[in-house]
Amino acid sequence: MASGGGYGDANAKIDYVFKVVLIGDSAVGKSQILARFARNEFSLDSKSTIGVEFQTRTLVIDHKTVKAQIWDTAGQERYRAVTSAYYRGAVGAMLVYDITKRQTFDHIPRWLEELRNHADKNIVIILIGNKCDLVNQRDVPTEDAKEFAEKEGLFFLETSALEATNVESAFTTVLTEIYNIVNKKSLAADESQGNGNSASLSGQKIIIPGPAQEIPAKRNMCCQAS
């Protein structure tokens, strides 16, 4: 289970650092989702991200302190040159579309293809339909997104950065899944350590993806008021 950490970095010892990337078209609310998670803030005057920025937040998962390093980039084509550096080292990804703009959902397969071309094959991915507070403007049926997520093996949630609906759940779902995968690797390594097959796993762990076990089946979650 994950428990909320401070908005800002705590002074506690960090056990893991997980890099998670936000991707999707411009103006779907990626930066707003990040601001809500990292600082519990929302601004109607938020400007489009130029280039790349990242923020951090610490959480406790299974009594371990995890620093989430969340990267946000512009969705515009002219900034696509940052691709390789942006995805390098990422162990989680959030594919974001706007439920009121069908085009942003229709572009998700392209973003997913780019992600899979540049990131580790075992990266944990969640599909996010943002702005679910705008019920009367919905242009993407929840079932369409659920079906796509199931077909591609992704987690799925609808969120509202404005109302803080499911934002925390989206991040903790990804981070907890990453932690579970890493923890299984650590246990396997500990078992082989007696045979001299593994280096010590003590101390801070900066998690970089590599060959790993298969990621378990994903869950689908829809927008619900907390």
From Swiss-Prot:
The primary location reported for this protein is membrane
Query: Which named protein is this?
Result: Ras-related protein Rab11A
GO CC: one term? plasma membrane
Q: Which residues bind GTP?
A: 24-32, 43-49, 72-76, 130-133, 160-162
Instruction: List residues modified as Cysteine methyl ester.
Output: C223
The answer, when asked if Coiled coil is one of the entry's keywords, is no
Keyword Nucleotide-binding on entry: yes
Q: Which UniProt keywords apply?
A: Cell membrane, GTP-binding, Lipoprotein, Membrane, Methylation, Nucleotide-binding, Prenylation
Which positions anchor the lipid (S-geranylgeranyl cysteine)?
C222, C223
Which family does the similarity line name?
Belongs to the small GTPase superfamily. Rab family.
Output the NCBIfam families linked to this UniProt entry.
Answer: small_GTP
Propeptide found at: 224-226
As for subcellular location, the record says: Cell membrane
- Residues forming the motif Effector region are 46-54
What organism does the record attribute this protein to?
A: Lotus japonicus
What domain of life does the UniProt record list for this protein's source?
Answer: Eukaryota
Q: What are the leading ranks of the lineage?
A: Eukaryota, Viridiplantae, Streptophyta, Embryophyta, Tracheophyta
Topology in the membrane? Lipid-anchor
Pfam families under this entry?
A: Ras
